[in-house]
């Protein structure tokens, strides 16, 4: 799910998913 994907990215980057996607 999108929430789980966001959590994974959060753990990997330590930042907000929005920052990772550059949205």
From Swiss-Prot:
GO terms for cellular component: extracellular region. GO terms for molecular function: toxin activity. Contains 7 disulfide bonds. Expressed by the venom gland. Keywords: Disulfide bond, Myotoxin, Secreted, Toxin. It comes from the Eukaryota. Snake venom phospholipase A2 homolog that lacks catalytic activity. Shows myotoxic activities. Induces local edema a few hours after injection (5-10 ug) in the hind paw. Belongs to the phospholipase A2 family. Group II subfamily. This is Basic phospholipase A2 homolog CTs-K49c. It comes from Trimeresurus stejnegeri (Chinese green tree viper). The lineage of its organism: Eukaryota, Metazoa, Chordata, Craniata, Vertebrata.
């Amino acid at each position: 799910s999108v929430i789980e994907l966001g959590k994974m990215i959060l753990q990997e980057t330590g930042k907000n998913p929005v920052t990772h996607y550059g949205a």
